[in-house]
Amino acid sequence: MNKYPLLSLINSPDDLRLLSKDKLPQLCQELRSYLLESVSQSSGHLASGLGTVELTVALHYVFKTPFDQLLWDVGHQAYPHKILTGRRDKMSTIRQKGGLHPFPWREESEFDVLSVGHSSTSISAGLGIAIAAQKENLGRKTICVIGDGAITAGMAFEALNHAGSVHTDMLVILNDNEMSISENVGALNNHLARLLSGSIYSTLRESGKKILSGLPPIKEFVKKTEEHVKGFVSPVGTLFEQLGFNYIGPIDGHNIHELISTLKNMQSLSGPQFLHIKTKKGKGYAPAEKDPIGFHGVPKFDHKLGELPKSSTTPTYSQIFGSWLCEIAVQDEKLIGITPAMREGSGMVEFSQQFPQQYFDVAIAEQHAVTFAAGLAIAGYKPVVAIYSTFLQRAYDQLIHDVAIQNLPVLFAIDRAGIVGADGQTHQGAFDLSFMRCIPNLVIMTPSNENECRQMLYTGYKCGKPAAVRYPRGNAIGVKLEPLAELPLGKSKLIRQGKNIAILNFGTLLSEATKVAEDLDATVVDMRFVKPLDTQRIQEIAQTHSLIVTLEENAIQGGAGSAVAETLYQQQQKVSLLQLGLPDNFIPQGTQKEMLAELKLNAEGIFEQIKQFLQKI
């Protein structure tokens, strides 16, 4: 820590608040350098945190955290917060098994008020916390930091609308890192922000409201004049004013002294406050400033070279999906690809560039994405919604009400199904089979490799009804890709004929199942479909084997194994059943390999679980 003389002194925000203001620019420089060095050695989210260094320092300098409650939305930008709140020396463990959590996490620190991972939750939770503090007359402040992407979600605006109507004391900070700040405009904004957040303006504003409340024409004139002055710099402010907030900004989010002055002024204001700051994602590190998307989440890399390591030559399942999408779009101009702000992650970059008229990024709006797709299907188009398993949870009602009930031909390409690795509890794709399996009209497919994935996507595209294909994060296994052809709905595939024991596989654990089967001389069936289920195959297997093992990378409760159990019960089959899958707890971070081993879903673990079960029967 010799390179970081000031940062090495900061073990909590109390230490930070002992520094004089003239030391803060140096601290910000050290914090940014330390963040870059630590993340490059451990992997993690980089660009967002580089852009919030000054904001983080200013917030902990002005507010008395943890008494004052600071909430970070999503959490990608909270690495500097972790460093300043006693976790500096553990940053090398972030996102690793047993290490620091990738996002703010209540169990990890008293400074983490809200556990996060999904976007747009901070204002709703913050309002609840603020109202509780107001009811108990605690005198504590509530501050929510939300990004320009997360604030586009409907939930954020629902919360803003509520907060403005109840007029509770809280501060919402919009971290807008869409573009760099113009120096001239920034200076004007900073000056205006000091005026608008100052006590004189605040007193005049509140007094004026009372005095002019009985004089509508004059009141309206004053209001419009005020908004015109603000709108000269930021027309967006009018929107938040209409929602009931006192809007300040935009100001330079990298000017530590201006941030502190504005925050100190706003600290004394009553009612809902809204501060709009402009930051640059990747600030202070040229490669990240140039490519903020590429440096959003990074593997281990040499930060001195500024180059990210090249990925494997084997395509990911996301890339397999993207290639399939392009292949079909050439033939069918009515194919429409939809993503809720996950173009890169879902493998849709090439598709968006080659077929811009058939591509829609609806922003962080999963509910809208699904019902938008329903509308396209009603109009005769063929929508494909590319969505992570964990984010499909946010559109469950739309999946049922707007797609399935109307039996509309919408295809769901469900990425990151199963264990996702380093992002932990909030991002595991553990529940999609369970929450989809009970929905009528929905076809659900689980590919075992990339060729099966392509065929299932094509089958879902052609079947004329709601369909879902769920596939994992990471690289495919390198099998040969065959010409596209529709699969017969609800029909499984025999992989290996054995005796006594049969493994019914759902998904990409098939390679592990076949390894186990060699040692046990077991039958292996790639079930392919969770719905409709191949009940005929299950009946045949039950009549010729003494033990059926179901294998899936989904919660055991309500998953594919449960579907098999229900079928065996309905058929009144006398056969033992072992259901293997994800346990009834939220699964923490770790690599996919580490977590599958811990959950005993690799070949060794599957073999062990079967042998232990055999000893009981």
UniProtKB/Swiss-Prot annotation:
It holds the Pfam family Transket_pyr. One of its GO terms (cellular component) is cytosol. It comes from the Bacteria. Keywords: Isoprene biosynthesis, Magnesium, Metal-binding, Thiamine biosynthesis, Thiamine pyrophosphate, Transferase. It catalyses: D-glyceraldehyde 3-phosphate + pyruvate + H(+) = 1-deoxy-D-xylulose 5-phosphate + CO2. The keyword Cytoplasm does not apply. GO terms for molecular function: 1-deoxy-D-xylulose-5-phosphate synthase activity; magnesium ion binding; thiamine pyrophosphate binding. GO terms for biological process: 1-deoxy-D-xylulose 5-phosphate biosynthetic process; isopentenyl diphosphate biosynthetic process, methylerythritol 4-phosphate pathway; terpenoid biosynthetic process; thiamine biosynthetic process. Mg(2+) binds at residues 148, 177. Thiamine diphosphate binds at residues 76, 117-119, 149-150, 177, 285, 366. Its EC number is 2.2.1.7. Catalyzes the acyloin condensation reaction between C atoms 2 and 3 of pyruvate and glyceraldehyde 3-phosphate to yield 1-deoxy-D-xylulose-5-phosphate (DXP). Homodimer. Belongs to the transketolase family. DXPS subfamily. This is 1-deoxy-D-xylulose-5-phosphate synthase. It comes from Histophilus somni (strain 129Pt). The lineage of its organism: Bacteria, Pseudomonadati, Pseudomonadota, Gammaproteobacteria, Pasteurellales.
